[in-house]
Every structure is written in structure tokens, then in C-alpha cells.
């Protein structure tokens, strides 16, 4: 396998067709890296040391790769596989929101939908565990969606630090976002950040706590959210 320095040098001499082939190769190398290496603390396979990618290159990689990656100001990070408790909580929240918003122009997405936005001039692309968007798709592929209103991240051991710090700060830069919620699958812990309250965290830890999602007019009990979680 060629070094990344060699690949980057060669890219300057390539035609459009050759560049597309190169992006395929980059995608394959990203996939190989994320399969072989253990996820570092905070992210499932940080690839920042390789090189900086344009947003267009990243999107092309995502279209070709069976693995998902997040994009932060030119850096690409492979995403790890969620654990059972994480998946159960995310599915429960998404199902409740989808049922509640039936017939409403806002849409609920769970895990597989990219959320792209600008943060202090940089492009960011995340895959929130659950989010509600109330705008229109930006392109034919549907990668982007305008006006996210609610974002929910379910914490995992490998992503908790990133979710609490980096993402909590970056999501605030989305003008349409009204609420950002962090959910710890074990033990019961819900943290709500609302724009209307200057993003000050509200922490709920009681087993009978009620999560009030004001941005979409839905209230869920902790019992509902954590149902079936071992």
C-alpha cells in the first residue's frame, strides 16, 4: 500500500476519472484502518493524521464505503459499532418521535442520516443517534437536511467525551436547533440543553424522571426510554 504522502503527491497529476479511482482507494484504506485498529479514546478510529479532506472528497468516500465516518473541519473519523443498550435506547426514542410526529412536516432520523452544518466557518458532518429535521433536503442524494430542531446523542464508552464536549459545543452553532439531549444508557441519566435557556444543562437521574422535549411537544418517561435495556 502506498504511503499517504505518495498518494497526495500523485493526486495533483490526476485527471477527473483517475481522481475518482483514487477516492475509491482512499475509501478502501479507511475501511481497512477501522477494521484493524482498536478505536482510540473518544472516537472510533481517528484518521486526522492521514491528511485533510475536502467536504466533496469526504462525501464521495461515504458513498463508496460500507462504513460510516464523521467529518470535522477536514478530518475524517470512523464510527464504531454501537452496543446493545445504546441501540435499544436510540430505537425507542426514534420510534416515539416518529409516532408523535406522524403527519407533521418534521421528520425523525435514526443513526443513518447525515447532519451537515457550518461551525465557525468549518464544515461539520455528524450522524446523530436520533434527530428531527424540519427543512428540505439540499441535494438529490439527500445527505443534507435543513433546519434540525432536536438532536439526541446516546452515549457510548468510546464517544461519551466527544458527545459531551465537542458535539455539545458544535451543535449550538446550528441556528435552527432548539434542543440537544445526551442520554446515558446505563445508569439512568438524561441531560437536556435548550437554546431558550442559554444551553444550561438540566440533569435528570431519577428512575421516574420525565424528559420534556419542548422542541417537538413530546414528553417521555425514563421508564419508556429505558424499556428493555438490560
Give the label of every model feature segment.
Residues 2-10, 17-230:
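Gly/Pro/Ser/Thr-rich low-complexity, intrinsically disordered segments predominantly at protein N-termini
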